[in-house]
């Protein structure tokens, strides 16, 4: 935490919106929630986890949609970040929802949590990323949108502009 002028510590909240990696459509009989990652998804997720690990990203909390493809992506990236798989919280409110529902989940986070990752789906992730940033218009599979807010409470998210916005995805060099 960087001190502000005058010596007051800065309180930051960092939100990572992460779209699940590429999923398989091979078995058309599978319910949508049960679709697994395909080969590209299984390659891309560790790559994105490695990129975050190189930046020393350490989440306090990982929340995932219950869909197999989202939870698998969360588990792969969590491993790269030395986050215990058993500590991933599966949240039904991250599957087949609206951007407002995601924002509601964020607003209810405990304020002691400073860095949270949400693993979910489009179109709601891109919609929320655009709403927060004003500039992100597309999140490809396995994209990571990172928002840093100068805030003490998660309830401020969506009401204040982020201090920093980063977007990374597997095909970005």
Over which residues does each language-model region extend?
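Domain-level recognition of soluble alpha/beta enzyme cores
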Residues: 135-165, 170
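Non-DNA-binding regulatory cores of transcription-related proteins
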Residues: 109-117, 122-143, 151
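Active-site-proximal alpha-helix that buttresses catalytic centers in soluble enzyme cores
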Residues: 13-14, 18-94, 101, 136-139, ...
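Residues that scaffold the ATP/ADP-binding catalytic core of kinase and kinase-like folds
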Residues: 27, 128, 157
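Short, surface-exposed amphipathic charged segments that create phosphate/polyanion-binding patches used
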Residues: 103-108
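Short, Lys/Arg-enriched N-terminal segments with co-localized hydrophobic residues
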Residues: 1-11
